[in-house]
Amino acid sequence: PFPKPSYLFAMVAGNLECLEDRFTTQSGREVLLKIYVEPGNLERTHHAMRSLKESMEWDERRFGREYDLDLFMIVAVDDFNAGAMENKGLNIFNSRLVLASPETATDRDYNLVQGVIAHEYFHNWTGNRVTCRDWFQLSLKEGLTVFRDQEFSADMNSRAAQRISDVNLLRSHQFPEDAGPMSHPVRPDSYQEINNFYTLTVYEKGAEVIRMMHTLLGEDGFRKGMDLYFERHDGQAVTCEDFVSALEDANDFNLKQFRRWYSQSGTPKLEIEGNYNQELKTFTLKVKQSCPDTPGQNGFGQRHKPETKSAFQKEAFLLPLKIGLLDEEGNPLPLKMEGKSINGKQQTLVLSEMEQEFVFEDLTKKPIPSLLRHFSAPVDLFYGYSEEELALISSRDSDEFNRWEAG
């Protein structure tokens, strides 16, 4: 057994049926797996069991996290008052997130079961072994675990389709929350009752904050940071700051400015202009970032009436902007900046100021920029594409998300 926060204790009693299986960990230990359901539902649990075993194998391979007990159980009942809960060794689910059969379940149902089973299992390390110091730090476990379950679903299915689905949810539900009277930072400053913490900003935008750090550090760098985080804080109740510090220290990468994502609310806006110089054969991207006023926080990059100003003054975000350049046929162009060729035909530009310029060299014709590839930051992007340029991106861009976005 391992120490756990008191909120993770669970005990279930009832008339239940059980599906059993076994999983062998990377170190050779055998773990007994049990899924308990109400009578008559047993035949619809096989997909959930497969998803659980896939989750356990994936977490070992991707993050080096092995399950720590000899028994893992799931209980699914029809009247559980939430979707699912990661109680240590005994996850509790609403039946709709466990049961699936070809006769009644859609592809979306199957994907949802797979994703939520993974999410609750992944909490064993990001939430249980390392938990939150207080509920203001909720995104420490939820934003991180949403990122992990998104990556799992992307690896199990279509990465592009998963990203499109995640961004659709963000834009349709979290962006309005960011723009409304209930707007709050990923790490909230205050609350009236505990449900105020369980928001799309804490979960979904929190996952985007984790994803941006993954983009800035790269897969290997992010894994190094995660390993250090677990090494330092296993068995502890910690903060978002502790997580960011582990990523910083493992990679010698300064994330001081990036921390503003945890304290500043609202959806940033990027306004981008592209200018081609035929004589110099250069293409310049001018990027301006701004963020609107939100409750209790004054925005930047815009004019304000004096009476609307608050004590909290937002500042420029640090964010990754993935881009590529296409020729008139839609072929990717080699990238060269400041006299240096860039390895590959995609570059991650790091934005840190309200206004910046990036100059690409040795271009014989005006390129078409493919901007914010894979939706590399949770922002509103504005660029003056023509219909012809959008059609070209939609049909020829190598970035599948941007092909969908341009359509």
Enumerate the predicted regions with their spans:
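Short non-domain terminal segments
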Residues: 7, 21, 91, 145, ...
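Non-catalytic accessory/interaction domains
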Residues: 1-3, 33, 39, 122, ...
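Intrinsically disordered, low-complexity acidic/polar segments
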Residues: 7-9, 42-44, 83, 102, ...
